[in-house]
Amino acid sequence: MLKPLGDRVLIEVSEEEEKTVGGIVLASTAQEKPQTGKVVAVGPGRTLDNGELATVPVNVGDTVLFEKYAGSEVKYDGQDYMIFSAKDLVAIVE
């Protein structure tokens, strides 16, 4: 399994619907980029200037909302993931 470093978070991105409510199939270029996903791994946090560790504010299993164009795509063991810095996470979905 991948273990993020620093304040990074590994997310399994939610799949978006390929059809509209009316049943029209959308081309992949017309689909909105997903902005939610499930946290699968969390780094230890970021070391502050005073030496203290600022932990990441999410936990494994959380569903999060993230910035639309942030993060890096990663493929590991046949699965697609994205890695984000904690600052690119917008909210926890409850």
Swiss-Prot record:
- What are its GO biological-process terms? chaperone cofactor-dependent protein refolding
Give the residue range of the signal peptide.
none
Gene Ontology terms for molecular function: ATP binding; metal ion binding; protein folding chaperone; protein-folding chaperone binding; unfolded protein binding
Q: Where in the cell is it found?
A: Cytoplasm
SUPFAM superfamilies in UniProt? GroES-like
SMART domains membership? Cpn10
Q: Which Gene3D superfamilies match?
A: GroES chaperonin
- What's the chief localization of this chain? cytoplasm
A GO cellular component entry from the record? cytoplasm
* One Pfam family matching this protein: Cpn10
| Keywords assigned | Chaperone, Cytoplasm
What quaternary arrangement does the UniProt entry report? Heptamer of 7 subunits arranged in a ring. Interacts with the chaperonin GroEL.
Tell me the PANTHER family matching this sequence.
10 KDA HEAT SHOCK PROTEIN, CO-CHAPERONIN GROES
Function comment: Together with the chaperonin GroEL, plays an essential role in assisting protein folding. The GroEL-GroES system forms a nano-cage that allows encapsulation of the non-native substrate proteins and provides a physical environment optimized to promote and accelerate protein folding. GroES binds to the apical surface of the GroEL ring, thereby capping the opening of the GroEL channel.
UniProt similarity note: Belongs to the GroES chaperonin family.
Q: What HAMAP family does UniProt report for this protein, alphabetically?
A: CH10 (MF_00580)
Q: What is this protein called?
A: Co-chaperonin GroES
* Origin species: Tetragenococcus halophilus (Pediococcus halophilus)
Please state the gene responsible for encoding this protein.
groES
